[in-house]
Amino acid sequence: MNFAPTEEQKMVREMVRKFSETQIKPIAAELDRTHRHPEEICRQLGEMGLMGVAVPTEYDGAGMDNVTYVMALIEISKACASCGVIASVNNSLYGYPVKAFGTEEQKKKFLAPVAGGKVEGCYALTESSAGSDAAALKCRAELKGDRYIVNGVKTFITSGNVARYCVLAATTDTARGYKAIINLIVDLKNTPGFRVGKVEEKMGLLASGTAELIFEDAEVPAENLLGKPGQGFKQMLSGLDAGRIGIGAQACGIGRAALEDAVEYSRERIQFGKPIATFQAIQFKLADMATELDAAELMLLRAAWLEDNDLDFEKEAAMAKYYASDVAMKAAIEGVQIFGGNGYMKEYPAERHMRDAKICQIYEGTNEIQRVVVARKLIGLR
């Protein structure tokens, strides 16, 4: 067993760390305060190959592995969680299904521009009545001639207000449940009958837009179908597995930011005539944060390695996602505690980490659903 990263992985991680420290971190607070979409950062990430880390080079990706992707996403998210989730969605939720199930023509047309950072992608699954029960979709796609006519509303779609392309999950027949689910690639800027609805006001990830997508007799070419009819639910689950690795990496980055900020602050904050870092109560908090975050990163790297080697990674991705997000939330809370009253103030980054961390326990499947996934794999239930 070799825990050492390759020279390429070390080089990429260091490159992303330097870029994130110098270009992203200095504007993270401003992005959070103004809710501004970091378009310039997204373009730069694309130019560096970080919007399609594991996408082959022939589709304008970096052609690297998923282990490298995890390392890169941790560093981006450590600097700015909003930038992290934007990169995660482009790489995983949007990029994975198009890469895995798209035709050659679809990959050239719809994957390459996103992987290269020219435009952004999103994945539209969630509906008001279809959250954890992902098979309960009501968004309807009816085939008429050479087009699908789509009607329905998608909610809480990350980057939905800025994305050019979207992988849309819809049903062709609500009575047939998961068997009727399909995935369509939609050009959101060139689809009659589509419009962006409400852009949500959120607790955290304030520089990442979360929007409602409304389809009213929207026309989508039938050639934009991913795979074949009846394969959509399986594609969806496979894409969510990949997405969970990305969200786990995002969580790990947030947790590491909380830890590093807490370490620095505890060295500088003087109480009772000495730095609070010398107090055992603070030391124990820092030690627990570091230990749990290290364990989470190792779990994520294992899941990514399994994916790279075409092995089943469903259980490991679920484990890594829920553990990483739980310990990130704990680290963020402890970070605020170590900062004391200052941690509650927007002048310091601790409160932002806590707001950003919470969603990682919820999206890409709640952590309760992750435990169901793990338990079913252990027991042998489908």
List each language-model region with its residue ranges.
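Long, acidic (Asp/Glu-rich), low-complexity accessory segments flanking structured domains
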Residues: 216-234
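Alpha-helical interface subdomain recognition
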Residues: 1-89, 101-106, 113-118, 143-148, ...
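Flexible, small-/acidic-enriched active-site or ligand-binding loops
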Residues: 136, 190-219
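Short Gly/Pro-enriched turn/cap motifs at secondary-structure boundaries
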Residues: 114, 129-132, 156-159, 172-175, ...
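Short Ser/Thr-interspersed hydrophobic loop/turn segments at strand-loop and sheet-helix junctions
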Residues: 49, 73-77, 170, 186-191, ...
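A short, Trp-centered hydrophobic/proline-enriched beta-strand micro-motif
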Residues: 117-125, 169
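A short core secondary-structure module
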Residues: 146-147, 151-196
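Short glycine/proline-enriched turns and hinge-like loops at secondary-structure junctions
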Residues: 64-65, 133-135, 159-163, 177-180, ...
